[in-house]
Amino acid sequence: MIARPRSVSYDFAVLRAVPHPYIGAFVPVGVVLHARTADYLGMRAITDIDELRAQVPEIDAELLARYLRSVRAICDGDESAGPVALTPPSERFHWLTAPRSDVIQTSPIHEGVCFDPERELDVLFRTYVRRGSG
């Protein structure tokens, strides 16, 4: 008998750069994915300063890149990111996706099922952030 790969449910949110938080217009710049049963929390984001500057010219690209690095550090559980980075992955995901009035906000949380959370994160990043740019 051939073993079938086990599917995993996940939640994800799109990271959005919001030049003017009170207006609400945004540009997708990353994705964060949490698969609780796989103990997975990952993030993909635009990291190139020139690309960030081109995508979101109204925001200081250096500042935006610094914020995105902070999100990555929290996802990775890097202790230099502060106490929230030391919490379990599910708490970090919910902290990252909590509503806030800031230059980086998240979309509503969506759910899905996959076999490989890392690969699914790449697919979501291409779908919602790259959208045909490679």
Where are the language model's segments positioned?
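Polybasic/polar functional segments that serve as interface/processing modules
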Residues: 1-134
